[in-house]
Amino acid sequence: MTTLSSQAAPAVNAVIERLQAWPGEHRVAVGLSGGVDSSLTAALLRDAQWQVEGLTLWLMSGKGACCAEGLVDAAGLCEELEIPHHVVDSRDTFQQEIVQFLVQGYGDGITPLPCSRCNRAVKFGPMLDWAEKERGITRVATGHYARLRPNADGGRTQLLRGLDARKDQSYFLYDLPQAVLQRLIFPLGELTKPDTRAEAARLGLRTAEKPESQDLCLADHHGSMKAFLDAYLPERPGEIVLTDGRVVGQHDGIEHFTIGQRKGLGVAWSEPLHVVRLDGAMNQVVVAPRAEAARGDAVVGAVNWVSIDPPAEPLDVEVQVRYRSAPERARLTPLPPVESDHQAERPHRCRLDFAEEQFSITPGQAAVFYDGEVCLGGGLIQA
């Protein structure tokens, strides 16, 4: 068994000890993006004497973290760690599941959330399938800041927030099915980002000082989100209107606006105006004073109950309506399923009644439900 390092932080040694005590076969494929988080994940598993193989999904051609730079860094890391490295060409899947999804959503006047969809449709399930089919490996580890709590009786594995509140990524993982969740490992869920940086530097990993991407991978790839949308959507100028229909300005495409936006409207008015609705059918951006942008409820569809069975009765939850937003108290009431839901395998819906009015509830974004540190599930805001 590996001797724990006196130079590593206690939290790092605790992670290695847990990995060493993990039940079952100690073989794992690590999803490598070429960043420091996935790099340290591979190194920790190696130091815990797991048989580790690196697996990188090739999502886009060209520059950027998901492309050439990420592939080179991932390959170099595997060479340093002396582990095999595999590249899986997932460009077609990414184009169909993410690029087309985003283009359709923005064109329809919603603000899509690609990351949770990518985790479900492009990354975790496909990585597990490839690893088992091609390498006989049944587990995948990634550098996500989240935790898992297995059920000793064979029930649901629970998804928990990462200990580093500033880096917690459970919001983007709510949509994973149990069959996937039960085969994942998140070693960094017990660490903070400074812990990760420090241990990567101590180990001399080539990615230790690599900066994080500050934007959506597609925005990073194209230079900006506007550049990405301009590349796929034709210019569609239209009107900016008040809720009573009065025209107060012009826009160059509703895809460049989001609910709650105040800056960049190009509208002079007696008080600040905020975007309260995007009307895809009329190609209009609807604006109003801040008070009219607040609301006390929301309908959420395509709900995935990740840590509990679908509830039959109302329950009190904490809700995040955006990744960086603070959890808000709400009463969740299950609604009858709708067969026409865009994701038929997840017909569950619910209504959220917030304890306090919320600003910028945005159709297309995820509402994720929590009970303390446990992520109960989530879905897409529909209205």
From Swiss-Prot:
<feature type="active site" description="Nucleophile">
    <location>
        <position position="118"/>
    </location>
</feature>
<feature type="region of interest" description="Interaction with tRNA">
    <location>
        <begin position="322"/>
        <end position="323"/>
    </location>
</feature>
<dbReference type="InterPro" id="IPR046885">
    <property type="entry name" value="MnmA-like_C"/>
</dbReference>
<feature type="binding site">
    <location>
        <position position="57"/>
    </location>
    <ligand>
        <name>ATP</name>
    </ligand>
</feature>
<dbReference type="GO" id="GO:0005524">
    <property type="term" value="F:ATP binding"/>
</dbReference>
<dbReference type="Pfam" id="PF20258">
    <property type="entry name" value="tRNA_Me_trans_C"/>
</dbReference>
<keyword id="KW-0547">Nucleotide-binding</keyword>
<dbReference type="InterPro" id="IPR023382">
    <property type="entry name" value="MnmA-like_central_sf"/>
</dbReference>
<feature type="active site" description="Cysteine persulfide intermediate">
    <location>
        <position position="217"/>
    </location>
</feature>
<comment type="function">
    <text>Catalyzes the 2-thiolation of uridine at the wobble position (U34) of tRNA, leading to the formation of s(2)U34.</text>
</comment>
<feature type="binding site">
    <location>
        <begin position="31"/>
        <end position="38"/>
    </location>
    <ligand>
        <name>ATP</name>
    </ligand>
</feature>
<dbReference type="InterPro" id="IPR046884">
    <property type="entry name" value="MnmA-like_central"/>
</dbReference>
<feature type="site" description="Interaction with tRNA">
    <location>
        <position position="144"/>
    </location>
</feature>
<dbReference type="Pfam" id="PF03054">
    <property type="entry name" value="tRNA_Me_trans"/>
</dbReference>
<dbReference type="GO" id="GO:0005737">
    <property type="term" value="C:cytoplasm"/>
</dbReference>
<dbReference type="Pfam" id="PF20259">
    <property type="entry name" value="tRNA_Me_trans_M"/>
</dbReference>
<keyword id="KW-1015">Disulfide bond</keyword>
<protein>
    <recommendedName>
        <fullName>tRNA-specific 2-thiouridylase MnmA</fullName>
        <ecNumber>2.8.1.13</ecNumber>
    </recommendedName>
</protein>
<feature type="site" description="Interaction with tRNA">
    <location>
        <position position="365"/>
    </location>
</feature>
<feature type="binding site">
    <location>
        <position position="143"/>
    </location>
    <ligand>
        <name>ATP</name>
    </ligand>
</feature>
<keyword id="KW-0963">Cytoplasm</keyword>
<keyword id="KW-0694">RNA-binding</keyword>
<feature type="disulfide bond" description="Alternate">
    <location>
        <begin position="118"/>
        <end position="217"/>
    </location>
</feature>
<keyword id="KW-0067">ATP-binding</keyword>
<keyword id="KW-0819">tRNA processing</keyword>
<feature type="region of interest" description="Interaction with tRNA">
    <location>
        <begin position="167"/>
        <end position="169"/>
    </location>
</feature>
<keyword id="KW-0820">tRNA-binding</keyword>
<dbReference type="GO" id="GO:0002143">
    <property type="term" value="P:tRNA wobble position uridine thiolation"/>
</dbReference>
<dbReference type="InterPro" id="IPR014729">
    <property type="entry name" value="Rossmann-like_a/b/a_fold"/>
</dbReference>
<dbReference type="GO" id="GO:0000049">
    <property type="term" value="F:tRNA binding"/>
</dbReference>
<dbReference type="InterPro" id="IPR004506">
    <property type="entry name" value="MnmA-like"/>
</dbReference>
<keyword id="KW-0808">Transferase</keyword>
<comment type="similarity">
    <text>Belongs to the MnmA/TRMU family.</text>
</comment>
<dbReference type="GO" id="GO:0103016">
    <property type="term" value="F:tRNA-uridine 2-sulfurtransferase activity"/>
</dbReference>
